Regions:
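Signature of N-terminal electron-transfer/Fe-S-associated modules in redox systems
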Residues: 2-137
Length: 137
């Protein structure tokens, strides 16, 4: 699915990291659930709702997460960021006001070599607070 999203459709936000489902750089949402696109056949997406990092740009969760990641310095090289944000968006769609422990658990399948995880977790927790105050689920 990752090759189709990037090469055919032109949605290049979904990254190729390991190709084995270990790093989370290729995370997308399929019917609201996070999946590693490198392990998903494109044909399996037929008739399903697929959301990439580009799709989150118009979504309030995506906007708030983007702002929180910038505010907390949760981005350095940026390679892992799309997968992290997509994974965090799925968490915030199902969990109001996640604490740090819940946020850490949610991103266990996403690897970051540059920033480390504390700033990312802080960004997710803050985004959850903002969205809860706004009444966004």
């Amino acid at each position: 699915a990752r090759a189709m999203l990037r090469g055919v459709i032109g949605l290049t936000g979904t990254k190729y990291g390991c190709g084995e489902g270990e790093c989370g750089a290729c995370t997308i949402l399929v019917d609201g659930q996070s999946v590693n696109s490198c392990l998903t056949f494109a044909v399996d997406l037929d008739g399903r709702t697929v959301t990439t990092i580009e799709g989150l740009a118009a979504d309030r969760r995506g906007q708030v997460l983007r702002e929180a990641f910038v505010k907390h310095g949760a981005v350095q090289c940026g390679f892992c960021t799309p997968g992290m944000v997509v994974q965090a968006a799925q968490l915030l769609a199902r969990t109001r006001r996640p604490d740090a422990a819940v946020a850490k658990t949610a991103i266990e399948g996403n690897l970051c070599r540059c920033t480390g995880y504390q700033k990312i977790v802080e960004a997710i927790v803050e985004a959850g607070e903002v969205l809860a105050k706004e009444g966004v689920r």
